Regions:
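Short, conserved charged micro-motifs
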Residues: 168-169, 321-328, 377-382
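Conserved glycine-rich beta-strand-loop-beta hairpin in the small C-terminal domain of fold type I
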Residues: 28, 232-276, 280, 284-291, ...
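Short hydrophobic/aromatic beta-strand micro-patches
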Residues: 161, 316-320
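Conserved N-terminal alpha-helix of the aminotransferase class I/II PLP-enzyme fold
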Residues: 1-29, 37, 50, 283
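PLP-dependent aminotransferase-like
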Residues: 11, 29, 36-115, 119-131
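Active-site PLP attachment segment
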Residues: 139-176, 212, 218-219, 231
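Conserved PLP cofactor-binding pocket of PLP-dependent enzymes
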Residues: 181-188, 301-308, 322-366, 389-407
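Non-catalytic, alpha-helical, charged scaffold/linker segments
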Residues: 173-242
Length: 411
């Protein structure tokens, strides 16, 4: 009998995590598998509005209703204590974010889910290597989605971690039904793209390459959020659950998110996974440096001082005039991504999501956070110093205006 697709990579992750793992071409496909396996169509999923818009569309593609939770103003993750009891009584699942690798309040969320008898799903795409109470993120819920395009910069690959082998085998079959045939040309591009990025950075060509891509219209996004295309999104809802119906949104930034990559891509991912611990160590060093700056939140400084640095995917730095700073940093060969502004309820509107009952913390955090790559910590500190970047603090928070657009973005 042939081995399941990607089983060697999955076995590597199983040894690291202590849970059965299913290999997937991306974390977004892994999350979709979990949502389809445990949630009936129409189920309501509690999630943070400070999140990748792709995740919103994965939830919609699964035929579910995203319910936006109040978040902590310090880290953008769900604040369980701020979720109204009426909301808790009317949700069918909870999806964590572990934003930038900072762990969710997963012990409280797990306790709530157990009381309610609903599944807890962990989006651990940013959080390989993060721990809570001595346990790795990805081992607290019913299932957890991991990404290899973050920490090891693989441009492909992910895992769905589950509790037992029987469930793993069931999900492998569901995954196989959703995979599309791979192509050698796409596999070559997936393999070479991270090498090209590394070369651009090492040759100090980030600024000219980025500006050229902007001028030529080669960037898939013109803003922090993709165009919503609301009328098409409304029409797609009639076909949910369906990845095909939501393809134009779910594939953004990763067109091969469900391609059956061949041995070339999987071989490269195996090499990159072998260097994961080295990557995590470098990230901890960068987090230590950035946590000691004025732009780090007190919560991050305290966590680093008492528990040691986390191997964050990005370090959320709190700054004034963030959008202008993003443009200025390109002059210092620093391109900032993973900015999730505006929050999903302001972005999508009440037709597609249930808005948060307290949107102010999410709006403040989303507007003031600059996600800093800890692998570039020294360069970023130098750039911030030269640019005289002012730190922001939520204690200065004034009433945040309702920034919901008069019509849905993308219409």
């Amino acid at each position: 009998m042939p081995m399941p697709y990607g089983s060697r990579l999955a076995a590597t992750m199983t040894r690291r995590l202590g849970r059965e793992c299913v290999y997937t071409p991306s974390a977004r496909l892994a999350l979709y598998l979990a949502l389809r396996r445990w949630c009936r169509p129409g189920a309501r999923v509690l999630m943070s509005p400070v999140n990748d818009d792709v995740i919103l569309f994965v939830v919609l593609a699964a035929g579910l209703r995203p319910v936006q939770a109040p978040v902590s103003v310090w880290d953008g993750n769900i604040d369980p204590a701020a979720v109204p009891e009426s909301t808790w009584r009317n949700v069918d699942a909870v999806l964590t974010t572990n934003l930038y690798g900072v762990p969710d309040r997963v012990l409280e969320l797990r306790r709530r889910c157990e009381q309610l008898g609903i599944p807890l799903f962990e989006d651990a795409a940013h959080a390989i290597g993060s721990h809570v109470d001595g346990r790795p993120i990805g081992t607290f819920g019913k299932a957890a989605a991991f990404s290899l395009s973050k920490h090891v910069a693989g441009m492909a690959g992910g895992f769905l971690a589950v509790e037992d082998a029987r469930t793993r085998r069931e999900l492998e079959l569901l995954r196989d039904d959703l995979l599309t045939p791979g192509r050698l040309r796409e596999d070559l591009a997936t393999t070479l793209r991270p090498l090209a990025r590394s070369a651009v950075r090492s040759l100090h060509l980030v600024r000219p390459v980025w500006r050229t891509m902007e001028r030529l219209g080669l960037l898939e996004r013109d803003a922090f959020r993709m165009d919503l295309h609301a009328p098409r999104l409304t029409a797609s809802a009639r076909e949910a659950p369906s990845l095909t119906a939501y393809e134009r949104w779910v594939r953004v930034d990763l067109h091969g998110y469900r391609s059956r990559h061949g041995s070339l891509v999987r071989g490269q991912l195996k090499l990159r996974m072998a260097r994961l611990d080295e990557d995590l160590a470098r990230r901890r060093a960068g987090v230590t440096l950035l946590a000691g700056t004025p732009w780090a939140s007190p919560a991050l400084r305290d966590r680093t001082a008492h528990d040691g640095p986390l191997p964050l995917f990005r370090v959320p730095l709190l700054v004034h005039d963030r959008d202008a700073l993003v443009q200025r940093l390109v002059r210092h060969d620093v391109v900032c991504g993973y900015i999730y502004d505006p929050p999903l309820d302001d972005y999508a509107g009440a037709e597609f999501v249930e808005p948060s009952p307290d949107p102010a913390p999410a709006r403040w955090f989303a507007a003031h956070t600059l996600p800093a790559d800890p692998l570039l910590a020294r360069r970023i500190v130098g750039a911030f110093t030269k640019e005289r970047v002012a730190d922001a603090h939520p204690s200065l928070l004034r009433p945040v205006p309702d920034v919901t657009p008069p019509r849905l973005l993308g219409q």
